[in-house]
Structures are given as C-alpha cells and as structure tokens.
C-alpha cells in the first residue's frame, strides 16, 4: 500500500497544482492551503479495505505538509447508493481529489462524471471502472491496481494442480457486475479450461462472507 500511496499522491498533487485556484468558495478544500484528498472505499467492515485505509492514513501522517486526507466508505459492499452519496458529499465538500475503490464498475460512473465536471481529480483503484461506460461519459479516469485476471489464473493453476483431471469445479464470485469480479472469474475459468476440468456451478456471494458461507454449505 505504501508504494501505491506514493504513486497516487504524486499524480494527484501534480494535477491539483495545475488546477485553477481562483475560486473564493469556502469549502473544505479551499479552507486549507494544501489539497484535500478523499479516499472513498468499499466496505470498511472488510479487513482488506481497512488495511488499505490504514496505509493511506499512515502515508498522510508522514507527509502531512503535502496534503490532507479524508477517509470514508460503505459498510456493505452491495450498498451502491450509499457510495454514490459519499461521492456527491465529497463534491459538495469541495475536495481537490477523489481516490475511489468503486463497489460497482458501472453504477459509480455517473457520480464520478459529476466530480470531474466539478474540477475534481478522480483516481480509480482496486476495482476498475468499466471502460465502455467511461467512454459513454467521455471520461478518462486513471486506474491503479493489479491484474485480477492474471492473479486469478495463478491461483487457479495452484489450486487445481492437486485435483484429478475429471474434477468438477464450483466458482463463488463477488458482485457479478464488478469488473474485478469478472476478471477474477475469467482468469480462474482459463485455469479450469487449461486443466481440462469443468465448471458445474457459478454463484455470486456479493462479497458477503455470510452469504458466501451459506452458499458453500448448501
């Protein structure tokens, strides 16, 4: 997370410095001499995203002279409306930048289009926004994150090597419309095909551990 934080902040600061600062609005971002960056996460009940938020806060604490940081997120990863509301709140607050891990690759694009129209720098992390939807809104939002497809392929190769050639495989994915979920499913299916095995069921757990456990034990 440290390397990602440095990259994100470098991109944001360079962009924000070139923005027009002639506005006399009394918003959050204008009240400070340094840019205000909003980190909009998925579920902060998920340890993975809590660790990401902690890493960002640690970086800001070490570089407090460069920027301010506002961290927020949703509790349930399927609560897309709440994450849209958070983006709109950040727009109203007048932040200079929004770094977002979108809960959905499509549903967040209209809200982020409003942010860009307001002159806010937007950076996409973790779950990539759907390129086709971005094109519809004439948006170019940079993405910083891993290749979920390659990662899932590697995981599949490792897991399947211990199974018989005629094994049947079940896939339990996250939110079906999320880009990272699609990429992970695709990568794992490639591993299954390469191992000459068959996927017999595909179900969505919506990134919910309780739901995933219920589906697995059913």
Where are the predicted features?
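A residue-level marker of the well-folded mature domains of exported/periplasmic proteins
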Residues: 17-218
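Sec-dependent signal peptide recognition
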Residues: 1-9
